């Protein structure tokens, strides 16, 4: 079952809330295909605050929170996403995402922090040049083994809209 609510708070602000509950039944093995157990009740929630024209004209911002409660774990996500138009051809899109997962049946846990920035430049009527770069910090414990990793990425490309 899913329930969603969208509400305009002001000319610049909108609120969005979604709630989903599932309970998938398991299957039995049959004709050589291995069955799987049911999931139990799983709850997925999402809350977003959407804003526009806050800092500069035609900017947009999303602040969001997600929470998932499943049989084996809980997941929390907090994210920020902004988009700024600079002139007619250039867009700047800074983002930040924080994920935390904790096990219910074990002490497993994971924290991921991902700041990224995307830039887009419009060349002509249909061609866009894109650049995206980001960093990831990951701290996790799995089967009582702690591990911290970091990484960077850079993506460049083009996109045509015909």
Which residues fall in each region the model found?
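Gram-negative and organellar
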Residues: 1-162
């Amino acid at each position: 079952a899913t329930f969603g609510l969208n509400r305009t708070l002001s000319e610049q602000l909108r609120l969005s809330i979604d709630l989903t509950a599932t309970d998938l039944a398991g299957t039995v093995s049959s004709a050589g295909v291995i069955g799987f157990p049911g999931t139990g009740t799983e709850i997925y929630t999402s809350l977003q605050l959407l804003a526009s024209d806050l800092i500069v004209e035609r900017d947009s911002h999303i602040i969001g929170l997600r929470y998932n409660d499943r049989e084996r774990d809980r997941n929390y996500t907090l994210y920020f996403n902004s988009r700024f138009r600079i002139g007619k051809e250039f867009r700047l899109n800074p983002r930040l995402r924080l994920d935390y997962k904790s096990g219910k049946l074990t002490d497993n846990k994971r924290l991921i922090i991902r700041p990224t920035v995307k830039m887009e430049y419009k060349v002509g009527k249909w061609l866009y040049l894109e650049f995206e770069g980001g960093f990831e910090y990951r701290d996790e414990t799995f089967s009582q083994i702690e591990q911290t990793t970091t990484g960077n990425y850079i993506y460049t490309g083009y996109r045509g809209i015909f």
